[in-house]
Structures are given as C-alpha cells and as structure tokens.
Design a protein with these regions (language model features):
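Histidine- and/or cysteine-centered catalytic micro-motif in compact active-site loops
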Residues: 453-457, 495-501
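C-terminal structural cap/anchor segments
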Residues: 480-484, 490-498
Length: 608
C-alpha cells in the first residue's frame, strides 16, 4: 500500500509539471532523488514529446528506483502511456498505460482531472485496470489477473485549511485476490464510500460493500491515525446468504478453531455499534440456518435466533432449532432462552431433548472477562434408552437405560474442570469419572485428563452387546491418569477384574477363544481335554486384564503372573480352565485391531 501511495505522488508530480509546459516541444526529465512521507525515489527519468493533438496523442515513459516508507530495499519501477493526451485544460488521459515494478504490474487506462471551481480545489481519477498482479514481501497480500475500475474524488476549500472531502468507487470485475486471511477466487464485488480526512482522522460518512452471492454491508465510522484504530464504528448488513458467507468470510476467521470445516445454509443479519472506542451493542438474527460439521461432530438444522446485546441494557436471548446431532446422538426440537446483562449471560435452566430423554442444564452463568469466556453450569442426563443410543452411534444393540449426573463444570482461561464426580448408570452398574480436566476443549487440539471407576457392571449384558461370547458375572475397572490428545488416548493405567462378592461366574467357550486372542500369539486356554466335548461353558474364580499405555505400547498383565506370562482367566471347579497370556508388550493399534476382530466374531484361538 505504501508503494502505491508513493507511486501516485510521483505521477501527480510529473503530470503537474507537464501540465504547465505547453510552450515546450519535448521534455526529458531527470531527477536524482525525491523524498516524501510515502517513501523515496532516485534515478528518475521521464520522456515526453509535446505538441500532440487529439488525433495524434504521444507516449510518455517514466523509469525510477523507488523505496516505499518501511521498505529496506530499492526496486525498479517502469511506467508508460501509449497515448497521453490533454483534451482540455487540467484534464489528462492515459490510454494503453503500463506499470511494472517488483510488487505490482498492470495495464490500465487513466483519466485525471485537477481544477478549481467556486473556491474548491478538486482532484479526480478514474482508472480501469486490466490483468493487474500484485503482492507484498510478507506474502500477506496478492492478486492475479485482476480487472476492475477505481474512481477517486478529492476536494477542499482553496483559501483556508480544511479537511479533504473524498469519495471512492471500486468495481472489481474479475481476477483472484488473497488478503490475509481472506481469499477471493473471482470478482463481481463492489465498494462505494465517502467521507472526510485530515491530519488526525479519516471519517467514513457512508460505505457500502457488496459481496457477490453473499449480500451487502453498510458502514460508517471514524478512524484515528495515531491510534491506528476505529474510535466510532457502525456496521449493518442486509440479509446475508450463509452458504456463501461461510467459505468466503467466516471460515478464514475460524481456521484455528473447531468450527473450521462447516457447511451452512439459511440467512442472517448483523448490526454492530462501537462508540468512543467501546463496544456498545450488536444484534444477530438467524433465519432457518443449517450448520453441519463436515467432520461429523455436530449439526443443527433450521436454527432461528434473536441474539441482542448492549452495554447499557439487559436483553433476552432466544434460540430454537428443529433437530440436529451431537457426536451422532440425535437432538430433538428445542427452544432455549437466556438473559444477557453487559458482559454476562445467565439461564436458570435449559432443557435439551436427546433421544427419548433430555439433558437438563442448570445454574448457567457465563462472563466475558479480559477477552476470554468464563462459565459454569450443572447438568443431569435424564434416563434414555440404550437401544436408541446404540443405534444412533452404530454400535451393537444395548439393552437397558442410561442416566448421568454431572456436577458443577467450570471453564476458565481455556481449561474445563469439574467440581465433583460425573456419575453414569449403565449395564446395571455405575461408572464414575473423577479429576476431569480439559484444555482447549473447543480448539483444534483438545487435551483431556481424568480417572475412571467402573463398579458392578453386568458382564452378561456387556459381552452379549459386543458379540464377545457370554461371561456371567460382574465387572469392576479402574482407569488411572487417562490422557487424551485430540480425543485419542496417549497414556493410561487400566485394570478390569471381576467384582468382589458371591455370584455365579461362568464363561462360554466363545468368550474363552476371544480372551485368548486378546492375549496375543501364544496365548492359550488350558482345559481338561477328556471333558472338553461335553461343555459349552465353564466356571471361573478370577478374571482380569491390565494395560499400561505409554508411547503407543500397551504393557499387559492379568490377575496374576507366571514365569512365562500372566493369567487372564483362572479356572474353578470342573472342568477347570485357565487362560494365559504371554505377550506383555503389545502395540496400541494392534490391540485395537484384536478387539475389533473378536467383537466382530472373526477370530478363533487354540483351545486345549
């Protein structure tokens, strides 16, 4: 931008000199050095043959080395007009123009006027660009094959100091532009603006931006030069097409968040006001908006929302949707209400219908402090059926119901923590999650740590659900120091074992085979051969398996150790059965593949 400003000043200087040289037949201009607040130029040479007529305009060429303000290196500049004409006083036409420098090249036509009327000094330029290309050394801005029209008008009182009145019109016809972080693959966009500028500020009285296929936004404001920011700003949009707005504007702004791969539809409007460098109000309205994560994590359909906010007054917020899903769990029609008061949001209770139950959230409180969100809430998951949940998740059919109690959850400075245990009732037993913390849960690389305890899970319901065979009994489990990065486990110390107490303990031959497969190559089930053919299930006294995951390797163990390995199932009664494992170090991905095979019924181990 500095180079363009400096170039404009250099051209105006040359044209201004030429415009007063009608008595001269030709001009060759050489300037050793020129300096201004926009930059420097050296070795400037210009050639122009005067005496041209309207019928036979003559060319002009200009060459120089320039260094815009802020740049450290000099670059070459070449400017030419195939036909420069002066059809009337104070008006110049440049047809077939060419401009080439290290960072900018284009063909153009230019009409420039400079006159004084009714005490007003007036300048105007109309530029038609053809196949323009530009870039900057930082790689933050670039354009290719850009075609368009630019109109600029300036005026101010001649005999007294005053701010300049300005007007700008840009019609971008075609070509592609990258303007960090936005990329426009084609043209068809327009911008019109007018206002005043002086030494301290630029006032935008009215500006209108029209984005092809998206909609229109109007703006007014006051930009302070020294502070390099808006002191006052108002933005009002028309009804915008969200399907076109997201890839063009929203996606680049959300690139480093969890919302960087969405598909949207519907329409929305926005009004935003800032006064005296303080946010004063905004109003966001959504009409029948669909939002779907292409990674399959969530979706909301037919969202209608009225979200007002102001610094001075409290407002009611309303949001409703007709359906969607969260991690493939269906969400039913929902209507939510909350209250905003300056930088805080509260809601005594929110109910989100899920499957045939609901997630009831209470004590919701959020605040925007030091440019970050801080919030807390409580929640209860009202009982819903496991068959519906398992079908939604694509799991084997599970019977029964699941419910949960979620204690106070707090989010602050990018960390989510719980004040208490998360309790889940499933498989006729209980699962609790303790010491839960999450870092950057809505970012692109979330991290989770927690401990888990499982108590008295029904092994029969669990093993039948996952086509594992049949194990009758109860199961306890502990997962200590669980660590997930981007929702994938990287570390834990886990143990599952039969629950203490007296109850029937039986295991089917199919389950024996699958457990043997989990033990890896060489795992065996030792059974009294003489009676093997008479039995489909066996008694056991102890069952258990451990896995300590570190560096993608699982160090495995069982209920006890042997000189060669570990015991996974310890037999009891007749027929006696013991399942042994020998591979203590197993790759995590390999173990997952084994689990996948045994739960799909595609394995058979040696039983002897």
């Amino acid at each position: 931008m500095q180079s363009m400003r400096f170039l404009a000043k250099l051209l105006l200087l040359s044209l201004g000199f030429i415009s007063h040289a009608h008595a001269i037949s030709s001009i060759s201009l050489e300037i050793g050095h020129v300096e201004s607040d926009a930059g420097e130029a050296r070795n400037v040479t210009a050639d122009y043959a005067l005496g041209a007529s309207k019928a036979a305009p003559t060319p002009i060429t200009l060459k120089a080395q320039i260094k815009p303000a802020g740049d450290k290196q000099w670059s070459d500049l070449a400017f030419s007009c195939a036909a420069l004409s002066n059809p009337k006083a104070e008006e110049w036409h440049c047809n077939g123009g060419k401009l080439a420098s290290k960072l900018l090249s284009t063909r153009f036509d230019l009409v420039f006027t400079s006159n004084e009327a009714k005490g007003q000094q007036q300048l105007a330029a109309d530029i038609s660009l053809k196949d323009a290309s530009f870039n900057d050394e930082a790689g933050l801005h670039a354009g290719e094959k850009v075609t368009g029209k630019i109109g600029l008008k300036l005026s101010h009182a001649s005999k007294q100091p005053a701010d300049w009145q300005w007007q700008a019109d840009i019609d971008w016809g075609s070509g592609e532009i990258f303007w960090q972080p936005f990329y426009f693959a084609s043209g068809g966009h327009q911008f019109q603006a007018s206002g005043t500028f002086g030494e301290k500020a630029i006032a935008i009285n009215k500006a209108t931006l029209t984005l092809k296929d998206v909609g229109q936004a109007s703006m007014s404001g006051l930009w302070q030069h020294e502070a390099k920011k808006f002191e006052d700003l108002t933005i009002q949009t028309s009804s915008l097409d969200m399907a076109a707005l997201y890839p063009l504007v929203l996606k680049p702004l959300l690139e480093k968040t969890a919302y960087n791969n969405l598909e949207m539809a519907g329409r929305g409007t926005l009004r935003f006001d800032m006064q005296d460098n303080e946010y004063k109000s905004f109003q966001l309205a959504l009409q029948d908006v669909d939002v779907e994560d292409k990674n399959g994590r969530f979706a909301l359909y037919k969202v209608n929302a009225a979200i007002p906010w102001s610094y001075d007054d409290a407002h009611d917020l309303r949001l409703a949707y007709e359906g969607g899903h969260l991690l493939k769990i269906p969400l039913r029609t929902t209507s939510l209400e909350a209250q905003t008061n300056r930088y805080s949001l509260t809601a005594p209770q929110l109910s989100l219908p899920i499957l045939d139950g609901a997630l009831v959230v209470s004590d919701v409180s959020a605040a925007w402090v030091n440019r970050q969100w801080h919030w807390h809430l409580r929640a209860n998951l009202e009982s819903f059926s496991m068959p519906e949940l398992s079908h939604a998740l694509g799991w084997p059919r599970m019977e029964g119901k699941v419910s949960a109690s979620i204690p106070m959850v707090t989010y602050s400075n990018g960390y989510l923590t719980t004040d208490g245990d998360l309790m889940f009732n499933v498989f006729n037993g209980a699962i609790s999650v303790t010491s839960l913390t999450m870092r950057d849960p809505l970012g692109v690389g979330p991290r989770l740590t927690a401990d888990m305890q499982m108590r008295n899970l029904d092994l029969g319901a669990l093993t039948r659900t996952f086509s594992f065979g049949n194990i009758e009994g109860k199961l306890d489990g502990d997962v200590k120091d669980l660590q997930l990065v981007n929702w994938q486990p990287v570390h834990f110390d886990a143990e599952v074992r039969d629950s203490p107490g007296r109850y029937p303990k039986k295991i089917s031959q199919r389950a024996v085979e699958n457990i043997s497969s989990l033990g890896g190559a060489g795992a065996t089930a030792a059974i009294q051969r003489s009676v093997l053919r008479f039995f489909d299930e066996f008694n056991y006294s102890d069952i258990g398996l451990t896995c300590r995951l570190h560096n993608d390797v699982c160090e495995m163990g069982g209920v006890s150790s042997t000189p060669q390995g570990y015991v996974i199932v310890k037999g009891s009664g007749i027929p006696a059965i013991t399942v042994l494992g020998y591979n203590r170090m197993v790759g995590w991905n390999e173990l997952l593949e084994r689990l996948k095979r045994v739960t799909s019924g595609n394995t058979k181990a040696i039983v002897r």
